[in-house]
Amino acid sequence: GAAGTAIIKLLNLYGAAHIIAVDSRGAIGTHRSDLNSEKTVLLQYLNTDQAGSLEDTLVDADIFIGVSRAGLLTPELVQTMATNPIIFALANPVPEIMPAAAKQAGAAVIATGRSDFPNQVNNSLAFPGIFRGALDHHVQKITDQHKLAAAEALAQLVAHPTADMVIPSPFDSRVVAAVAQVIR
């Protein structure tokens, strides 16, 4: 979907070295003849052409970022990942795996889209500041560089990251100003 595509594009632009995208039929790559135009666009951002299922692609993976459906990621799959994996289970209202289950399976950092768990990843972290910055600085088009700068500004608000605080809360009073400042 649109969220997954945007995440992949920005991770690639930021320099992520090994991105694998997976849909209901498995890893997306040039080996697939069933890709629609939206999925074909992803090929330019993927650093690999790994084939296989979600299960195959998770073996020894460091990070899982999901924007799909509740329950997709099981504790057993987390246990096949690298030691201390990072899990961003962003499906709403129910994430791909619940934080307690991910942690029990060995995840070091867990983020969801929900405000009732630590590390809420939500567009409310970025949009108010992006719009404030665009208005204040007369920016007519939000670019990928603006999005990366906003992500960096958010990250800098957490001076001493912990497993339960890798990103500020959307309710942190500094968020809007920090993001707005970098939209120029």
Describe these PLM feature segments:
Residues 1-9, 29-30, 71-76, 95-97, ...:
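Short glycine/serine/threonine-rich phosphate/pyrophosphate-binding segments
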Residues 40-108, 115-116:
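Rossmann-like adenosine-cofactor binding region
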Residues 22, 38, 76-77, 83, ...:
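A sequence-level detector of short, solvent-exposed, charge-rich linear segments
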Residues 89-184:
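Adenosine-phosphate binding glycine-rich loop
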Residues 6-10, 56, 60-63, 76, ...:
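Alpha-helical scaffold segments in soluble metabolic enzymes
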Residues 1, 10, 44-54, 63, ...:
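Hydrophobic alpha-helical scaffolding
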Residues 1-66:
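Glycine-rich phosphate/diphosphate-binding loop of Rossmann-like nucleotide-binding domains
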